[in-house]
Amino acid sequence: MKGLCVAACTLVLAAATPLTPRENTCTQGSKTPYGALTHSACPCWNWYEIQTGDGDCGKVASKFGVSREDVIRVEPGRVTPPNPLPTPPCNAADAPYPVGKGTVCGCKKWYRIRRGDDCGPVASEFGISADQLIEWNPWLSADVDGTHYPCMNIWPTDNLCVDVSSF
């Protein structure tokens, strides 16, 4: 979900051996791409960079001969059914790319996420609440195994709507 379908994000696919996510239990190797989630299956031996046109996780999974469910199991934070990949926003021909699926229509101001950003500080910078930021950019949140994680999917190079004042 980290802005899936853009070159800056990555998706983990475990090689042959089924793995389950284990947060903070090991350190990924030196070839771990920037943007890998801390709760990705660990250790991971194969990394895949999402390409424009990859579609959803099922299409990517089929490239590696695994099921969509396998991808979800090793990379739970990347996937929220039914289609986790971002699409261009409605009514915003001038919107930057990438913009996550479900971004509010008619956004008046955009912010490009930088490394180290988090929802609270970004929202404060633009005089809005973190709840407003997430409401306008719902793809920031994820539900994993019944637990809701607000602002889990804030990834560098993705774009956030930070103002709908004239909307």
Curated annotation (Swiss-Prot):
Q: Which keywords does this Swiss-Prot/TrEMBL entry list?
A: Chitin-binding, Signal, Virulence
Output the InterPro entries linked to this UniProt entry: LysM1-like, LysM_dom, LysM_dom_sf
Residue stretches making up the LysM domain: 109-162
- What's a single GO MF annotation on this record? chitin binding
Tell me the leader sequence span: 1-16
What did gene disruption experiments reveal? Does not affect virulence to host insects.
Q: What induces it?
A: Expressed during in vivo infection of insect hosts.
Note the superkingdom of the native organism: Eukaryota
User: Miscellaneous notes for this chain?
Assistant: In plants, chitin acts as a microbe-associated molecular pattern (MAMP) that is recognized by lysin motif (LysM)-containing plant cell surface-localized pattern recognition receptors (PRRs) that activate a plethora of downstream immune responses.
Domains (record comment): The LysM (lysin motif) domains are small globular domains involved in binding chitin in eukaryotes. Blys6 contains one5 LysM domain.
What family does this chain come from, according to its entry? Belongs to the secreted LysM effector family.
Instruction: Say what the protein does.
Output: Might have a role in sequestration of chitin oligosaccharides (breakdown products of fungal cell walls that are released during invasion and act as triggers of host immunity) to dampen host defense.
In Swiss-Prot or TrEMBL terms, this protein is called Secreted LysM effector Blys6
